[in-house]
Amino acid sequence: MPPPQGDVTALFLGPPGLGKSALIAALCDKDVETLEAPEGRPDSGVPSLRAAGPGLFLGELSCPPAAPGPWAAEANVLVLVLPGPEGNGEPLAPALGEAALAALARGTPLLAVRNLRPGDSQTAAQARDQTAALLNSAGLGAADLFVLPANCGSSDGCEELERLRAALQSQAEALRRLLPPAQDGFEVLGAAELEAVREAFETGGLEAALSWVRSGLERLGSARLDLAVAGKADVGLVVDMLLGLDPGDPGAAPASVPTAPTPFPAPERPNVVLWTVPLGHTGTATTAAAASHPTHYDALILVTPGAPTEKDWAQVQALLLPDAPLVCVRTDGEGEDPECLGEGKMENPKGESLKNAGGGGLENALSKGREKCSAGSQKAGSGEGPGKAGSEGLQQVVGMKKSGGGDSERAAALSPEDETWEVLEEAPPPVFPLRPGGLPGLCEWLRRALPPAQAGALLLALPPASPSAARTKAAALRAGAWRPALLASLAAAAAPLPGLGWACDVALLRGQLAEWRRGLGLEPTALARRERALGLASGELAARAHFPGPVTRAEVEARLGAWAGEGTAGGAALGALSFLWPAGGAAATGGLGYRAAHGVLLQALDEMRADAEAVLAPPEPAQ
């Protein structure tokens, strides 16, 4: 088995406003995930990172305000993005020049890019000559220069962009044979991230720094999902209900019908994007919708005021690949959820509950259940689809039977052509009524219809709308709880300072517990929203929740204190990975170690799961 190849990072450095983000987006595939700096910290001095392909990551950092030197030293390839003579400030800032010279001295490949803008006074040839002279005067004449024409990233067949892409891939292929992999079965923190943690501990902002690193590690391996919500009205209402937002909340979709496809990333998992897509009145999607990015969505929710018609279904077909999930929400609330999505159970074609399917039968039953949900009977709410499902949709084809002979003779002579076949007509996609309590059946159907990686991303991105969804999401969060627990110990042990371990434990756990509380729909605003929707008395749902909130530093310290006896065990557990950091582990820096942090997380998650189940339980019928 050949050893794993290394991972290469190309860092794009330059002043803000030169189109670095657009350039990286043009070089990358749309299905990869970007790790952005945390919201509210635009000048955090930490690069964003995006995967351009197997083993190649493209980073971006604006200098100023960030200092380029430390990050340039970490890069395997350095790309300078330079302004034109019309730009404000110096064409090449001293700090950028020094970082580039140091990179050349280390033997780091150096590239330079000049982005032409619409209205620039220089031609491409003039810009090339002017930029080459600038590089020569700074001692950087060895850099490969690329001059990109205006709107190069948004047009196909840009020759200079393809040259740049080929140069990056060529450098990456050469370096991957020499560099170690950035990830090989475990999460690794780079020196720059550890330095940022230590700096934040000394100057403030430790919780924000750790939360950003944690969310970045979580999202690095998370699937991208583009989910379209298309219709002529009320698409914003459906998006906000799925995201658990009120109109006017940050990130909420407006009530007005969009004029073009508009993205709304999930607040906790921005790799899951809900798109509001307007539909035209001529029987097809509007030109803007059909030509927007992405060209095809991973799944689509059609929003109609009543029962969908054949024309409604035909309008959205161009926005989807043939096998992509398609479903409808009718906003009048009429009809029932499809029968195959009953709460807590799903029947396989033979009527056996999944709970009775042992061993490998569970996967087979789930697969058959998915087929039944997509091709099975649609009762009330299915409307006027392209065909009728159910018993009327079955056509009996009677095979030829040979006469004479006994049962054994007929059995021996039986062939596939002689059997009786049942042909199912293609059923319309399922239709879910919009109810005040949310769309739990729709969310469950989407998770079953999507590929596993995207289904998992959707599960973590949306707040649960039913007790079973809360249990499923809590189980997924529990399976990933080792990441934040290990991260606190890694950060503290790799940069041992007195008190840093305890500070990392408290800051990271506080941020993680607060995120889980939001993700499970236990914030006061979420509870009040559900109370209003269901017509419950104010405070009724809050009384069912017992996990203390908001998550305070004192609460986290108290929970960690209860685990104080686990500190030694936590340090021993970290000893298995002692080659990654100085001896002593988290215990040497005052932290409680992996086991304690993990125990606090799991205990709190169990409490929050119980609260979410209680809050989402169906209201008792009025007497």
Swiss-Prot record:
In this entry, which stretches build a coiled coil?
155-180
Q: Where is this region: Disordered?
A: 334-393
Q: Name one GO molecular function term.
A: protein-macromolecule adaptor activity
Q: What induces it?
A: Not induced by interferons.
Q: Does the keyword DNA-binding apply?
A: no
Q: Flavoprotein: is it a keyword of this entry?
A: no
What residue intervals hold the motif LIR 2? Answer: 421-424
Q: Where is the composition biased (Basic and acidic residues)?
A: 342-353
The record, for InterPro entries, names:
G_IRG_dom (IPR030385), IRGQ (IPR040070)
State any GO BP term from the record: positive regulation of autophagy
Family that this chain belongs to: Belongs to the TRAFAC class dynamin-like GTPase superfamily. IRG family.
Q: Report the protein name in the record.
A: Immunity-related GTPase family Q protein
The source organism is Homo sapiens
